[in-house]
From Swiss-Prot:
Residue ranges of the region described as Disordered: 84-120
Organism, scientific name: Arabidopsis thaliana (Mouse-ear cress)
GO molecular function annotation: zinc ion binding
Positions with biased composition (Acidic residues): 84-110
Keyword annotations: Metal-binding, Nucleus, Transcription, Transcription regulation, Zinc, Zinc-finger
Localization annotation: Nucleus
TM region(s), chain numbering: none
UniProt protein name: Transcription elongation factor 1 homolog
Length: 120
């Protein structure tokens, strides 16, 4: 008589670590000062700094976690900063182009005056 086939033990389930709900502020860089609040009743997520009182709110879904709200805030800050940098860079380029045009006009004026000297 043979042995019965033994069953393998089920693999142990891994515990999921809880995600952070308190983060550092992107404005004042104070560690653990931003707290994320999720209002499922109104589907609004809010991240607010207790130190500098900056805040950000966004619409949420049933799957949204605190880290998602904070990540959206950081992404929005980066998007605004790059947009401002682009505007400043465009303004600087326009000023440089205007200066170059003025220099070219000055150079043309110099050439005209030299020609007038020889025309007499």
């Amino acid at each position: 008589m043979g042995k019965r086939k033994s069953r393998a033990k089920p693999a142990p389930t891994k515990r999921m670590d809880k995600l952070d709900t308190i983060f550092s502020c992107p404005f004042c860089n104070h560690g653990s000062s931003v707290e994320c609040i999720i209002d499922m009743k109104h589907l609004i997520g809010k991240a607010a700094c207790r130190i500098c009182e900056e805040s950000f709110s966004t619409t949420i879904t049933a799957l949204t976690e605190a880290i998602d709200i904070y990540s959206e805030w950081i992404d929005e800050c980066e998007r605004v900063n790059t947009a401002e940098d682009d505007v400043v860079q465009e303004e600087e380029e326009e000023v440089e182009e205007e200066e170059e045009e003025e220099e070219e006009e000055d150079d043309e004026d110099d050439h005209v005056s030299v020609k007038r000297k020889y025309n007499f």
